[in-house]
């Protein structure tokens, strides 16, 4: 089966259908609810790989079984919900008499009974007992200092020397004659008085009566060190009767005799605890309380990112680069520097001050400023005024005497608006008036321009209140503006026709005009052609456009 991977893949849409058709016992409740029958049937109808008719029948069987399972699960859920609702809302058990509609106060109110807490009585606490319960008694923490005789005579010898001394007598063998330490003579009376001190152990080795062996043990260096630790304030010496005997004289004249039935250096316990050593109560104030660590609070910035306005404000902020100009007390030189140091003065005057005043005036006249921004409406008005001003200059230059060049040196103004481009256009106009043909054309147009000036002033007076009233509606302003231009062009053509001109050249009308003015005149020609005021003709592509009178030339 080449399409086995389509049917048997675990994530495929037909896997659960194939499982339901062939192995229904393996189908779980989750498989049934996850299976979308609508998508599955679409996959069966339009499979990626062609499926045999028998296989598609098996898949439809799986669809039916899954649908049957879903119906059973839905029926079981509905039955369970119905039973729960029936058990919850029992109509026979809810009916109550009218007097029992409202519960009594005691039935819905908790009694205010305050029981005693299981805490100890603060007055019954014995503070002294509380602090002394962790203190031990002296006899529990103190080592006993009672040493037996076995410890005295067996310490640090491991039983070797005692065995030797037990077999050899001091009087028979000279074993310890070379031992270091002074030997002092002692009387026999002191010897008999001291024997009872060392023979009370009764260890059962049979040396209780051997006085010589006990004396030999006591004369060894190691045993003398132990005796010094036991605070014996006497020395032991040998009797003077034998020739090699040695005696030890006591340092003190008094002899302290210790009874045999009493142990040496035994710790004496006092009867009362007050006379003995007791620990003082512990002061709780001395114990520094463990400082509780504060839970560190996680601080998150409320502003996680910078907005575009904040970034733009930071980029355009010049507070760090500009400062307030602080000048010294004003003097004539400082004021002159302040006046001449401005941007307007530097960009509109010469860099040198040693220039004549007339030369400065000429420099100011020839200075061209660019990049001066005007509003949309003001730019169009300025273009119209420049056009009319140029034509007015041509008219005055042709009508007046030959000293017209001196008159051109003075700027011609219309409504006190002077632009740098006017002066350049004046020079271009003067250069173009060289040929006789141009002079004749300019003379013929002079009369037209004089009438157009009057019409333009009248139109601006008429349209100015309308424009002021309709500033809010920009579309109406644009329409009125173009209507004024078209009407101006039509009046100009009418004046030329009255002077005898039957055809009008667009190239001649656009002479000494910039691109924007030429486009406006061409658009005016097209609108007049649409209104049948003029007829347009062109001999060749990109050639001059010639306009002639149309049927509505004088009727618009």
From Swiss-Prot:
Keywords: Chromosome, Chromosome partition, Meiosis, Nucleus
Family annotation (Pfam families): Rad21_Rec8 (PF04824), Rad21_Rec8_N (PF04825)
Chief localisation class: nucleus
Biological process, per Gene Ontology: chromosome segregation; meiotic cell cycle; replication-born double-strand break repair via sister chromatid exchange; sister chromatid cohesion
InterPro entries the UniProt entry points to: NXP1_M-like, Rad21/Rec8-like, Rad21/Rec8_C_eu, Rad21_Rec8_N, ScpA-like_C, WH_DNA-bd_sf
Places the protein is found: Nucleus; Chromosome
GO MF annotation terms: chromatin binding
A Gene Ontology term for the protein's cellular component: chromosome
Family membership noted in the UniProt record: Belongs to the rad21 family.
Complex formation: Component of some meiotic cohesin complex composed of the SMC1 (SMC1A or SMC1B) and SMC3 heterodimer attached via their hinge domain, RAD21L which link them, and STAG3.
Function: Meiosis-specific component of some cohesin complex required during the initial steps of prophase I in male meiosis. Probably required during early meiosis in males for separation of sister chromatids and homologous chromosomes. Replaces RAD21 in premeiotic S phase (during early stages of prophase I), while RAD21 reappears in later stages of prophase I. Involved in synaptonemal complex assembly, synapsis initiation and crossover recombination between homologous chromosomes during prophase I.
The name this protein goes by in its record: Double-strand-break repair protein rad21-like protein 1
Species assigned in the record: Homo sapiens
Source lineage: Eukaryota, Metazoa, Chordata, Craniata, Vertebrata
Gene name as annotated: RAD21L1
């Amino acid at each position: 089966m080449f399409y086995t991977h389509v049917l048997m893949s675990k994530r495929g849409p037909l896997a659960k259908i194939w499982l339901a058709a062939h192995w229904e016992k393996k189908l779980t409740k989750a498989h049934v609810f996850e299976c979308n029958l609508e998508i599955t049937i679409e996959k069966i109808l339009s499979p990626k790989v062609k499926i045999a008719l028998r296989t598609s029948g098996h898949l439809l069987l799986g669809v039916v079984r899954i649908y049957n399972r879903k119906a059973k699960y839905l029926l079981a859920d509905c039955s369970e919900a119905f039973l729960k609702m029936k058990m919850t809302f029992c109509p026979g058990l809810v009916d109550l008499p009218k007097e029992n509609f409202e519960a009594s106060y005691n039935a819905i109110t908790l009694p205010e009974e305050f029981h005693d807490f299981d805490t100890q009585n603060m007055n019954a606490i014995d503070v002294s007992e509380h602090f002394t319960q962790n203190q031990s008694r002296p006899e529990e923490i103190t080592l006993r200092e009672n040493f037996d005789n076995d410890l005295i005579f067996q310490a640090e010898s491991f039983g070797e020397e005692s065995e030797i001394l037990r077999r050899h007598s001091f009087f028979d063998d000279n074993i310890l004659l070379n031992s270091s330490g002074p030997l002092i003579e002692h009387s026999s009376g002191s010897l008999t008085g001291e024997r009872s001190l060392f023979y009370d152990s009764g260890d059962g080795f049979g040396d209780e009566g051997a006085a010589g062996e006990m004396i030999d043990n006591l004369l060894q260096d190691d045993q003398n060190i132990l005796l010094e630790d036991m605070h014996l304030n006497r020395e032991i010496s040998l009797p003077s009767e034998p020739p090699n005997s040695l005696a030890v004289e006591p340092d003190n004249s008094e002899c302290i005799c210790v009874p045999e039935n009493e142990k040496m250096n035994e710790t004496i316990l006092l009867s009362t605890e007050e006379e003995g050593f007791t620990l003082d109560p512990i002061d709780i104030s001395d114990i520094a309380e463990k400082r509780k660590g504060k839970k560190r609070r996680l601080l998150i910035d409320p502003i996680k990112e910078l907005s575009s306005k904040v970034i733009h404000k930071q980029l355009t902020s010049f507070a760090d680069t500009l400062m307030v100009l602080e000048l010294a007390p004003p003097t004539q030189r400082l004021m002159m520097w302040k006046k001449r140091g401005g941007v307007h003065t530097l960009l509109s005057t010469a860099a040198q001050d040693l220039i004549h005043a007339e030369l400065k005036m000429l420099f100011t006249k020839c200075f061209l400023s660019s990049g001066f921004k005007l509003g949309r409406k003001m730019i169009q008005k300025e273009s119209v005024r420049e056009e009319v001003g140029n034509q007015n200059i041509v008219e005055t230059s042709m009508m007046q005497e030959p000293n017209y060049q001196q008159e051109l040196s003075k700027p011609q103004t219309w409504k006190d608006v002077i632009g740098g481009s006017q002066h350049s256009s004046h020079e271009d106009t003067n250069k173009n008036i060289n040929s006789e043909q141009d002079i004749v054309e300019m003379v013929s147009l002079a009369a037209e321009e004089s009438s157009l000036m009057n019409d333009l002033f009248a139109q601006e007076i008429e349209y100015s209140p309308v424009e002021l009233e309709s500033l809010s509606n920009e579309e109406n302003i644009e329409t009125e503006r173009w209507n004024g231009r078209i009407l101006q062009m039509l009046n100009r053509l009418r004046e030329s026709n009255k002077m005898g001109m039957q055809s009008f050249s667009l190239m001649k009308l656009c002479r000494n005009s910039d691109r924007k003015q030429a486009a406006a005149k061409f658009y005016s020609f097209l609108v007049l052609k649409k209104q049948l005021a003029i007829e347009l003709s062109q001999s060749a592509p990109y050639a001059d456009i010639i306009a002639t009178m149309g049927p509505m030339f004088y009727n618009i």
